[in-house]
Amino acid sequence: MMNPNRSATPAPSKPVAAVTDVVDTTEARAPMRDAANPSRIRDAPETRTVELSTGRLEVTVLGGTWPLDELCDFAARENAKRGFLVVSKVLGRHVPVRPRTMRRSARDLAERIPADLPGPVMVVGLAETAICLGQSVHEELRVQWGRKDVYFTHSTRQRLDRSLLCRFEEPHSHASAHLIYEPDLPGVPAPRSLVLVDDEISTGTTIRNLADALVGAWPGIETIAVAVLTDWSCGFGWHATMPRPTTSCSLLRGRLEWKAGAAVAPAVASASDAGSLGRMARHENFGRLGLSEPIDRAPNTERPTITGSLRIVGTGEFTYLPFRLAEALERDGHDVVVQATSRSPAHLGGAMTAKLRFEDNYGTGVPNYLYNADPTDGRTTWLAHETGTGTMDDALVRALDAQVVGWAS
């Protein structure tokens, strides 16, 4: 367990700015150009209009090191709080992605995080979307910085029989409650710096809520870095509301203007609130209780024989180890893509070309979805899970003619 009263040996650092300072490092560092794509740097605003079934989205790109079309697309959400969804093309969630693309985006993002943060540093990934991204950034930071005082944890919507560190809310989400558990890191002092990782930021409210909760639990935090793939928060001034001096970085920054259209009824009414928390009676620590080093574990079940191209599907919050498996197979020469199931209800159209609905393998009773998985594309599907034998919905297994691969017995 981390000790909030134990002081760490200070690491060399620059003077900390005032809490109200707004520091965005997205364009501050030397631009990274891709030799295969010299136009990667955007030096002029780009504007486009996206028509969705729930309304109209005006997208303005202000800068970045990745083009918009490589990073994300957009879809209509089944959510009255927010009618659109930013659909990442590099996360391995809603859109199938090659592992090397996921790795490159995480590495590029990690390179933009200030390397002189005072330690210990805690990297925090937001459930469910940014868990794999957060763990990948943690992995990259330890390599890039050559430091061992960089740790990882992530928020979760699963209740465990462990001590809760804090709780916070994601107001616009279909599943607003997040839990963070006390890290099981004996002898490790409480962090002095936070690196908060998410796929995108719009108003900054969720990041501020997370930061407030963590600073309340760890008052010794001195500075915060926020790292997101796409930053749409221009004009919201959220840095000034953060509880500690904050820098932010992204691969692309811009602005979104949403005009809601006529209300579109959800395709399926959920019998239970999508914010329901699950409960894991048995749990292996793949990140919820903190990690000092990156994990890379083979499945407990026998790995199926590979015949042809492959799709590896993570489930819910269990995404990092399936990604690592896919990455290893890709290095061995296999044609493999990664994606994952989601609690996010979205309409078909825009970035969503296919949609499967099925029961949650975590037992919450909340419908889950898999998008853009074409069962006729010739790929063999492996469904990866952490929830034990017999927890995967047979309807999903049959729809994809999938083989189930488990990391828990």
Predicted regions and their residues:
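PRPP-associated nucleotide enzymes
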Residues: M1-S409
